[in-house]
């Protein structure tokens, strides 16, 4: 018989740097999950992606066991990494923070495809371009 799901917890944690401190500890502790067990497993799985924020979906079962699935980093994080900037524009319509060519947008869209609700890479590219525009990043042909 299948285990009963007690809760699904969604968190965004820096890759390889999960600690029992907030937000991880309290989120898992209230469901009775072995926090150190999760932290060790998460850090092992995400060690190769250091420097990125990785969303994770933790499924907690009634017997207090858990499984987790890591997702692709948020588009905003990938765009900032591609441009090498720390923060996006506070006023995206007035102040642009950089220019990104379409080939780089395609790379990011292809990386994000498994987590995006898009039928094609072109649709995923439009989603990534929308995120870029809202961050003050100009998309140029190239």
From Swiss-Prot:
An example Gene Ontology cellular component term from the record?
Answer: cytosolic large ribosomal subunit
Q: Does the keyword Ribonucleoprotein apply?
A: yes
Its BP terms in the Gene Ontology are: translation
Q: Keyword annotations for this protein?
A: Methylation, Ribonucleoprotein, Ribosomal protein, RNA-binding, rRNA-binding
Q: Which GO terms describe its molecular function?
A: large ribosomal subunit rRNA binding; structural constituent of ribosome
Read off the CDD domains from this record.
Ribosomal_L11
Which SMART domains does the record match to this protein?
Answer: RL11
- Domain of life according to the entry: Bacteria
PTMs per UniProt: One or more lysine residues are methylated.
Mind telling me which SUPFAM superfamilies this protein's record contains?
Ribosomal L11/L12e N-terminal domain (SSF54747), Ribosomal protein L11, C-terminal domain (SSF46906)
- Provide the disulphide bond pattern: none
Task: Give the family, as the similarity comment puts it.
Answer: Belongs to the universal ribosomal protein uL11 family.
NCBIfam families membership: L11_bact
Task: Briefly state the protein's biological role.
Answer: Forms part of the ribosomal stalk which helps the ribosome interact with GTP-bound translation factors.
Recorded hits in HAMAP family, A to Z, give: Ribosomal_uL11 (MF_00736)
Subunit structure of this chain's protein = Part of the ribosomal stalk of the 50S ribosomal subunit. Interacts with L10 and the large rRNA to form the base of the stalk. L10 forms an elongated spine to which L12 dimers bind in a sequential fashion forming a multimeric L10(L12)X complex.
Name the UniProt record assigns to this protein: Large ribosomal subunit protein uL11
Gene name?
Answer: rplK
């Amino acid at each position: 018989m299948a285990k009963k799901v007690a809760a699904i917890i969604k968190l965004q944690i820096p890759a390889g740097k999960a600690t029992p401190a907030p937000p991880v500890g309290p989120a898992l502790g209230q469901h009775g999950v072995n926090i150190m067990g999760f932290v060790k497993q998460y850090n092992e799985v995400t060690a190769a992606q250091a420097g990125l924020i990785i969303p994770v979906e933790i499924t907690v079962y009634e017997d207090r066991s858990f499984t987790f699935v890591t997702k692709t980093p948020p588009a905003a994080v990938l765009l900032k990494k591609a441009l090498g900037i720390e923060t996006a524009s506070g006023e995206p319509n007035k102040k642009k923070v950089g220019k990104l060519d379409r080939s780089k947008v395609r790379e990011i869209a292809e990386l994000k495809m498994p987590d995006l609700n898009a039928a094609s890479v072109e649709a995923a590219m439009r989603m990534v371009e929308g995120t870029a525009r809202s961050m003050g990043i100009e998309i140029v042909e190239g």
